[in-house]
Regions:
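N-terminal loops that bind phosphate or other acidic moieties
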Residues: 1-147
């Protein structure tokens, strides 16, 4: 039997791939001969880059950008070279997981770093952009990234 698992992440506890691997282990307990393929899945927030880059044979990039509280963060994004497309998660540069519970205040956060990721992708030849906007710690309507 051939089975594909594609499970979204469980915020704060498991990545998409960890959840898929857990399901695969459970399937193998019942049927040791099953062929289980684990694929990442995301809804536009955390895990979107991993899912799309994996499925579209892209490459991962890392760039230091301004985080949601104006501190430096390393943001990972993807490039699909065949279409010059960048795959970006707002969560990577301005995500809620980058802000402690005590510091969560949308009046103090920015999407500026998302714009820096876009600039890096442009510098690497990208002309198309897929931007997942889930998992954000911001409420600036994207004004920060336009700066």
């Amino acid at each position: 039997m051939k089975i594909v698992t594609a499970i979204d992440s469980f915020k704060g506890s498991m990545t998409s791939m960890e959840a898929g691997q857990a399901a695969a282990e459970g399937i193998h307990r019942v049927d040791a001969d099953a062929e289980v393929i684990v694929r990442p899945l995301a809804d536009g927030g955390e895990g979107t880059v991993e899912a799309l880059v994996s499925g579209m044979n892209g490459t991962l990039q890392k760039v230091q950008v301004t985080g949601p509280l104006s501190e430096p963060v390393i943001c990972e994004y993807g490039i699909i070279e065949s279409t010059k497309t960048a795959v970006i998660e707002m969560a990577g540069a301005a995500g809620i997981t980058l802000v402690s519970d005590e510091e969560r205040n949308p009046l103090n956060t920015t999407t500026y770093g998302v714009g820096e990721v876009i600039r890096d992708a442009i510098d690497k030849g990208c002309r198309r952009f897929l931007v997942g906007i889930g998992g954000s710690a911001t409420n600036d309507g994207g004004v920060g990234m336009l700066q």
